């Protein structure tokens, strides 16, 4: 099943593919990103997840000023997890964040301080609440499923279960 893409999604993707460095200038303003059609494959879900990762502020009123920018931007996952999570990043406060490549393979994860097992979904909820200061997507919502698909795609080829060694 072919799913049409909105021009606001297609144009930045084409610019990013054709012109290195153009992606940041061409991205749509952050806000609420809502899936407009059902997806029929994990690749489509991951593509939607990438858009949510880059553009959804989850209702947060927080802003940040990227390096070399003249104005502030709404907080999104991409505010801290640069290059779509494919590179190491920092929070606006300066804390180091590792790349998200392989991150999905590290879940579930035991958090000793909380004596709890965190699933990937629970970690996303934590990041949206504590990092973005927004309202996280519901656990079985299309947005959560798409975010998990995106992070899982970034983990393709990673060995699962390394946290149990």
Region spans (language model):
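Positively charged n-region of N-terminal signal peptides that target proteins for export
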Residues: 1-4
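Generic hydrophobic-segment detector
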Residues: 6-7, 39
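Intrinsically disordered, low-complexity segments enriched in polar/charged small residues
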Residues: 7-8, 23, 86
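Bacterial N-terminal signal peptides
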Residues: 8-18
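Sec/Tat signal peptide C-region and signal peptidase I cleavage site
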Residues: 19-25
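Electron-transfer interface patches adjacent to heme c in soluble/periplasmic c-type cytochromes
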Residues: 26-44, 57-165
């Amino acid at each position: 099943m072919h799913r049409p893409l909105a021009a606001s999604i297609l144009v930045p993707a084409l610019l990013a593919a054709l012109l290195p460095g153009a992606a940041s200038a061409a991205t749509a303003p952050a806000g609420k990103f809502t899936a407009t059609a059902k997806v029929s494959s994990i690749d489509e879900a991951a593509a939607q997840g990438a858009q949510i990762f880059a553009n959804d502020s989850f209702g947060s009123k927080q802003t940040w000023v990227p390096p070399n920018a003249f104005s502030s931007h709404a907080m999104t996952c991409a505010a801290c997890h640069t290059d779509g999570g494919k590179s190491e990043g920092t929070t606006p406060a300066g804390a180091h964040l590792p790349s998200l490549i392989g991150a999905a393979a590290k879940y579930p994860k035991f958090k000793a301080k909380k004596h709890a097992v965190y699933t990937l979904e629970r970690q996303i909820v934590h990041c949206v609440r504590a990092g973005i200061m927004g309202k996280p997507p519901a656990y079985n919502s299309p947005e959560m499923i798409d975010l998990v698909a995106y992070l899982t795609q970034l983990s393709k080829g990673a060995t699962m279960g390394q946290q149990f060694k």
